[in-house]
Each structure stands twice: as structure tokens, then as C-alpha cells.
Regions:
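Alpha-to-beta junction loops
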Residues: 157-159
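Conserved "HGTGT" condensation-loop signature of ketosynthase/thiolase-family condensing enzymes
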Residues: 1-133, 137, 151-154, 170, ...
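Short conserved active-site loop signatures built around small residues
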Residues: 142
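Glycine-/small-residue-rich beta->alpha transition segments that form the dinucleotide
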Residues: 167
């Protein structure tokens, strides 16, 4: 259990948590329809910061994304006396695309686009001296970041975690979701019979968490879990298995009657809302009120999990279940309790659930508590098998393997020579090909291939360059206004965690899948995170390591089972 000591939200609705909460309670939203905005041909509805806000938040030396995150963090830190220079403080940044809008300028040096670089810029500006960790786990990134903070603090790696979720919007993200036919040009309607898709939004939200309580009965994160559907990289499973497993993990031994509400992801896409309703019902929580906040903020991507957790804390403090804006008539098969009106509650607990591309699902349990209640488990594990792949060679458990070719041709040769029974390999982006081949060789060495689902193995990977190769491929499809054709096949791979989803699908792994980005490779920090991740008592082993693909001549995979 870890404890909230401060929070902050910046969005089009306001620049403090209080301003945002009061706006939502009053039913206000900043969703606006845009026609030909940023020269995007198709109309869309989104919640974007005003030009006045952008100018007010501007900081010399920081990008728009970095400045928004910085201001949110500073807004939270002002409520504390935290010494951010201390070695017991860590910054955890949650984002899906960070500085991706810089890619349109086609820079020779791509490193400013890497999310870990952005995190380091923010940390340096704040004076934080420890290495920042970026969580890039698709739409569940914010919840994943809170869970990572919970684990690192419970494992006593740090005493304080500054968790900031942030994303800005731009032609890259908006056209990408449009290419998937997921965007509505009208205000979204979560869980509604007439829902037609999501709206995107901009926001930054920060939670400062502590290992020890700072007040008698404040908000705490008691449990958190991430589980995978092992079904499809861009579509949730029909039975909501990953979400159900995540809910089951955080509610074990808890009385549902104590819950004020479940704050769902509620994107207003056809399949997400349907899946969540089924998962909630299957988890036995269909008598608990459910709400969603996308009708106020839009889908704020990497900010969503943090923003919506903070808002849920504020609502429960106000004894209020916030209404689901845009909802009128239930349009999902799961029999869940929804309303577009605010309602009263005396509950002192809530669940925040979320799902994302790559098959990932996350959930956390927020409670009012002043009591330390750690659920740490033994985290001592040994590496049993290792695989290393470079552009010129591959080794398995220290033994060099026969192969031909160099660069990307090497990966194709390894696939044909040692695997050759999974044609989807040829549809994958380079990062996924690298991770897929490395994992296949690793599991062959382990000799424990299973055809039935298992949730006791996690997949936790790290890198520096995120999904830069897929990003460039997608950017090429929208770069030229005369040859504008956003590619859904390319866009779906513009998240590095997709490689964890591909491995999970191949092997029926329904345990945790997480992806972290560091400014530079740091084996000690990676081991710290992996060991802390074993705090999830369901996880018995981890397929983990470093998977980085900067270009066809510069890539490395070093993965292992522990």
C-alpha cells in the first residue's frame, strides 16, 4: 500500500485538480469539433488546450509536451515539502507518444523523440537526480505507472514516487486513430447504444505517492494488477478475460459492498465498452455503480489512468459518483449500473480499470487508509536462460547459433531457420520481429512451451528508442499532403508494448505485460523493476530484458527468463 500526498491536473477544463473536479461535477466539457485542424482532412471532436493555455504553460528549452508535464508536477510538488534532489525520490512518466509531433520535422537526430529523453529533460528541469522511468504501455500507461510506483515503494527502492501522466494531440495520433475508424466526429457516448467512437484529449496529471502515510486517513493505492487478453493486438477479447483477471487480482478478499464505484475506461468505442461490461459482470461487480470520464476530457492516452484516478479520489471525498457524460441508454450486454447523473455515495474505496492495445488491461484499488499494509512477496529469482541478438550474431545461453545475413536480414534468417511456423511474423514491425524471434529462441531453450493459457508468467521489456521504426513508417503515410493515406497497419505498431502483446498471443500468456523506456540502458535499474514486479503474487516467472531497434543496422535484444 502506498499513500497519496499531493496531486495536480492540467486539462482544457482547468489547471488544478479542484478546477477540473468542479467542472466535471457541473457537467462541463471542452470537447469541440475541428474541421481541417492541423490540415487533417477528416473532422474530429477533441478536448485540446487553448492557445492561451499553451502560451501560459510554455517554458524555454522544453517542448509543449514536456512543459505541460512539468507544470503539472510543479503544481503537485507545491503541496509538499519534498526534496526532489534526494536519492529516495523517483520520477515515473506515463505517456504513449510523448514528443512524437517532432517527427514531422524529419530530424536527423531522433533521440529527442524518445520518451525516455523527454522524461530526462523534465527530471533535469525539476532537479531530480535519480533516473526517470517512462511507462509506455498503450492506453493503460497511467495505471501501469501507478502500479510501478506501488511496487517500487513497497520494495523499499524509494520512499517517494512522482507519477505524471501526459500526452498532447497532433496529426500523428489523431490521424492514426482515424485510420482505425475509432474516432467520432461528435461528442463521445460511453457505453451508450448510439456510441460511434472516441474523442481524443490533452492533459497532464500528477500523483505524488509516499511509502508511509502523511495523514491519519488519506487516499492510498492498496493493490494493482496488469493482465493480458492474449487475443489480439488491437481488439479486446469478447469475454474480457484480461480485464476480469485484473479485477479478480485486486478484489481478492475485498467486500464489493465497500466500493463507491468502478471508474471504467469507457472510450465509447464499440468493442472496448462491450468488453468492459462483460468483464465487470464476470468479476461479480455488476451491482457496483460504474462511470466513465471520457465525455468530459476525451481520451487523454498516457494521462488517462492518472487523471481519472485523481478525479475518482476527489469525487469519493465529495461523496459523489460522477455521472457518465454522453450516456443515455445502455448499449452493452454486460448488466452494469450506469447513469449520466451525479449520485451520492458513502463508499471509501473505488476501482480504476483500463485497457489498451497489445491486449493489456490494468486495475487498481484506491482506499481511504492511514495504515501501512504491505503485501510484498519474495522477489529473489535467478536467470535461467538468456538470448542475445545483435545485427551480426545471436547467442543462446552463451552459445553462438548458426545464422546468415546481417541487420534486418538476420532476423528473417533466424525466423526461417529456427521457427518458420508463424506467418504473422511478416506483418510485424522491426521491433516486434526482434522481440518475437528472441522470445522464440528463449522459450525453445527453456523447453516449456504450453498450448493452454497461463497467467503466472509476466512479459516485462525495456528499451530506449520506443517504437521509432514503426513511428517513421506511419509518419511517411501522412507526411505528404498530396499523398496522404494514414496506414492502420503501420499505426497499430507505433506503441512499443505491442511486442509484449505479440509474445503473449503467441504463447497464450495472460499474465502481466509491461513496457518501460529508459534514457539509456541501465541493467541495475531494470533488475530493480523486475524484482519489484514479482510483488504481484500471481507472477511466478518473468520473460524480461532489453529490446531496442533504432534502425536496421542498430538493434539489440538481450532477453532472459527469471
Amino acid at each position: 500500500m502506498v499513500f497519496k500526498i499531493a496531486d495536480s491536473i492540467i486539462s482544457p477544463l482547468g489547471e488544478t485538480t479542484g478546477e477540473n473536479y468542479l467542472a466535471v461535477k457541473a457537467g462541463r466539457a471542452k470537447l469541440c469539433r475541428y474541421d481541417h485542424h492541423w490540415q487533417i482532412p477528416e473532422p474530429f471532436t477533441a478536448s485540446l488546450l487553448t492557445e492561451e493555455q499553451n502560451q501560459r504553460l510554455k517554458i524555454e528549452g522544453l517542448t509543449r509536451f514536456e512543459a505541460m508535464a512539468y507544470h503539472s508536477i510543479v503544481g503537485a510538488l507545491r503541496q509538499t515539502n519534498l526534496d526532489v534532489k534526494a536519492k529516495n525520490v523517483v520520477l515515473i512518466l506515463s505517456t504513449t507518444k510523448g514528443n512524437i509531433e517532432l517527427l514531422a520535422e524529419q530530424p536527423a537526430d531522433k533521440s529527442p523523440i524518445y520518451p525516455g529523453t523527454a522524461a530526462q529533460h523534465i527530471a533535469d528541469k525539476l532537479g531530480i537526480t535519480t533516473t526517470p522511468i517512462t511507462v509506455c504501455n498503450a492506453c493503460i500507461s497511467g495505471v501501469s505507472a501507478i502500479i510501478l510506483a506501488l511496487r517500487l515503494l513497497e520494495a523499499q527502492c524509494y520512499d517517494y514516487a512522482i507519477v505524471c501522466g501526459a500526452d498532447t494531440q497532433n496529426p500523428f495520433t489523431i490521424s492514426g486513430f482515424q485510420s482505425l475508424k475509432a474516432v467520432s466526429d461528435e461528442a463521445c457516448k460511453p457505453f451508450d447504444l448510439e456510441r460511434t467512437g472516441l474523442n481524443l484529449g490533452e492533459a497532464a496529471a500528477t500523483l505524488v505517492l509516499a511509502r508511509e502515510p502523511h495523514q491519519d486517513k488519506g487516499w492510498a493505492i492498496k493493490r494493482g494488477a496488469v493482465r493480458n487478453d492474449a487475443f489480439h493486438i488491437s481488439s479486446p477479447s469478447k469475454n474480457g478475460e484480461g480485464a476480469r483477471l485484473a479485477l479478480a487480482a485486486i478484489t481478492e478478499g475485498e467486500a464489493a459492498e465497500g466500493l463507491a464505484f468502478i471508474n471504467a475506461h469507457g472510450t465509447a468505442t464499440m468493442f472496448n465498452d462491450q468488453m468492459e461490461s462483460v468483464a465487470i459482470e464476470r468479476a461479480g461487480l455488476n451491482e457496483t455503480p460504474v462511470n466513465a470520464y471520457k465525455g468530459y476530457f476525451g481520451h487523454t492516452l498516457g494521462a488517462a489512468g492518472v487523471l481519472e484516478t485523481i478525479l475518482s479520489m476527489a469525487a469519493a471525498d465529495d461523496h459523489t459518483i460522477l455521472g457518465t457524460r454522453g450516456f443515455e441508454e445502455r448499449g452493452v450486454s454486460g448488466k452494469i449500473k450506469l447513469s449520466n447523473q451525479n449520485a451520492a455515495t458513502n463508499g471509501q474505496q473505488f476501482i480504476k480499470m483500463i485497457s489498451g492495445f497489445g491486449g493489456c488491461n490494468g486495475a487498481i484499488l484506491g482506499v481511504k487508509s492511514g495504515e501501512v499494509n504491505s503485501e510484498r512477496v519474495n522477489s529473489e529469482k535467478l536467470m535461467t536462460h538468456t538470448v542475445e541478438i545483435t545485427p551480426k550474431a545471436v547467442t543462446v545461453d552463451g552459445k553462438q547459433m548458426a545464422c546468415e545475413g546481417e541487420g534486418k536480414a538476420l532476423l528473417t534468417d533466424l525466423y526461417k531457420r529456427y521457427i518458420d511456423n508463424y506467418p504473422k511474423f511478416y506483418k510485424m514491425d522491426p521491433l516486434c520481429r526482434l522481440g518475437f524471434v528472441a522470445s522464440e529462441l528463449l522459450l525453445q531453450a527453456e523447453g516449456d512451451r504450453r498450448d493452454t493459457p497461463r497467467d503466472d508468467r509476466a512479459i516485462i521489456l525495456f528499451n530506449r528508442s520506443s517504437s521509432i521504426q514503426a513511428d517513421e513508417a506511419y509518419q511517411a503515410s501522412i507526411q505528404d499532403a498530396e499523398d496522404y493515406f494514414p496506414s492502420p497497419a503501420a499505426f497499430v505498431y507505433t506503441l512499443p508494448n505491442i511486442v509484449t502483446g505479440e509474445i503473449a498471443i503467441r504463447n497464450h500468456y495472460q499474465g502481466e505485460t509491461s513496457f518501460y523506456i529508459l534514457p539509456e540502458r541501465n541493467d541495475q535499474l531494470m533488475q530493480q523493476i523486475l524484482k519489484a514486479s514479482l510483488g504481484d503474487k500471481t507472477t511466478k516467472s518473468i520473460l524480461g530484458g532489453w529490446i531496442d531497434y533504432e534502425d536496421d543496422e542498430n538493434f539489440v535484444a538481450k532477453v532472459f527468463v527469471m
